[in-house]
Amino acid sequence: SNSGKNDLLGELESNMKKTFRIKCFKLVLGVSLCFLIYLLVSLIIPPLIGTHEKSDTQAEVSITTSERVCLIDNNEDALLWRLRLIRSAQEEIILSTFDFRADSSGTDVIAALWGAAERGVQVRLIIDGINAQLHLSGSDVFQALAAHDNVEVKFYNPIRLTQLWTVNYRCHDKYLIIDRSTYLMGGRNTSDLFLGSGGTSRQNIDRDIVVYNGGFTTASANTLLEYFDRIWLLDTNRAFHAEAENH
């Protein structure tokens, strides 16, 4: 009968719609999983960049310098050196880091930077955009620091949905420059995982160096400053402005 045919056609159409919805759901789920895997892998694997010839990296260089170098192997000393250098600053502080967290050690650094800004020292911070967005931008103490008139903060290449292919362009630089002369550089981020005596159940083993020359700017300090200036002015950075009305 016509009624039976209509029922059959209706059921067939309903099944087709259901099958279509299932396929669409699987497609969206698959694309989402692929993107998530891509994002996670991008955070782990640095971009493959090779701009120097092998012969350049193996060249022997002889340099005579009056700079002095101090090696820092201990995580407690690493925090104390950062605080000591920040407190000694008279004109300018530059800090670049991949990961900065408002935990115990990170808050100590934030407090020292705030104290320097209160003394009239100009403070510039550049922090990798992914970690800053995940771990730092919502911190009240960091918001207070960023709202200070003498502090500028930039996030390096934060995630942009319109430029997902750049998600693995991360900034792993970790250095602290004081008054354009003395600087600390190494592999430690600014958090309990790398600094201090035990704000976390485990700590990374890493190393820093402090390079100084009695307050006089040297060739290596100038090279680092030039590099910082290039990174600071990149269009991929985003200035972080604290919500001053909350502080």
What is the predicted role of each segment?
Residues 13-34:
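N-terminal Sec-pathway targeting helices
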Residues 34-53:
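Membrane-interface motif at the C-terminal end of an N-terminal transmembrane signal
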Residues 54-70:
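Short extracytoplasmic/periplasmic juxtamembrane "stem" segments immediately C-terminal to an N-terminal membrane anchor
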Residues 72-82, 109:
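Glycine-rich, highly charged phosphate/nucleotide-binding loops
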Residues 74-76, 106, 158-165:
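N-terminal post-signal-peptidase region of extra-cytosolic proteins
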Residues 89-154:
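Primarily the HKD phosphodiesterase
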Residues 99-102, 129-133, 159-162, 182-183, ...:
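Solvent-exposed loop/turn segments at secondary-structure junctions
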Residues 171-247:
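Signature of lipid phosphatidyltransferase scaffolds
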